[in-house]
Amino acid sequence: MSRIGKNPVPIPEKVSVEISGLTVKVKGPKGELERVLPDGVSVSQADNAVTVSPSDTSRRSRERHGLCRTLVANMVEGVSKGFSKKLEIIGVGYRAQVKGKKLVVSAGYSHPVEMDAPEGVTFAVENNTLVTVSGADKELVGNEAAKVRGIRPPEPYKGKGIKYQGERILRKAGKTGKK
């Protein structure tokens, strides 16, 4: 049995959970999330907690036990607190701004790169160089942050590019001239 999976997921106040078969719907102040869990697990709600247990003793069920518990826990945390990722833009002339629901990034290309925010994700920019991607769905926030970073990943020689806040970039020594 999974050590993570056997812990119940506490449900805070102002959050409601509906379970029908393998479909879990979570509603809270930050939004509403719905997910269909994979086969091999059973989900139940008692008191103010959601419990995930394997439906049988097969290897597949035991593998998915901890995963499903974590997915439900992330849904509950997302609708109550929300998730966010911060990215730093480093480089001369590199900047970002928000126009409506679009993020416009100038990262050294001949044209600015525009990204639309999907449903449930918001972009915020501070000082033209700090981008915050936030929303209720942890997976969606992480994917959008990775797409923003993918516009201009940090390079190892000067460190220019878009990186996660707190990410360490291994720097390389440049070429040495002939002396």
Swiss-Prot record:
GO terms for cellular component: cytosolic large ribosomal subunit. The keyword Translocase does not apply. Keywords: Ribonucleoprotein, Ribosomal protein, RNA-binding, rRNA-binding. The keyword Ribonucleoprotein applies. The gene is rplF. PROSITE patterns: RIBOSOMAL_L6_1. InterPro entries: Ribosomal_uL6-like (IPR000702), Ribosomal_uL6-like_a/b-dom_sf (IPR036789), Ribosomal_uL6_a/b-dom (IPR020040), Ribosomal_uL6_bac-type (IPR019906), Ribosomal_uL6_CS (IPR002358). One of its GO terms (biological process) is cytoplasmic translation. GO terms for molecular function: rRNA binding; structural constituent of ribosome. PANTHER family: 60S/50S RIBOSOMAL PROTEIN L6/L9, LARGE RIBOSOMAL SUBUNIT PROTEIN UL6M. It comes from the Bacteria. SUPFAM superfamilies: Ribosomal protein L6. Part of the 50S ribosomal subunit. This protein binds to the 23S rRNA, and is important in its secondary structure. It is located near the subunit interface in the base of the L7/L12 stalk, and near the tRNA binding site of the peptidyltransferase center. This is Large ribosomal subunit protein uL6. Belongs to the universal ribosomal protein uL6 family.
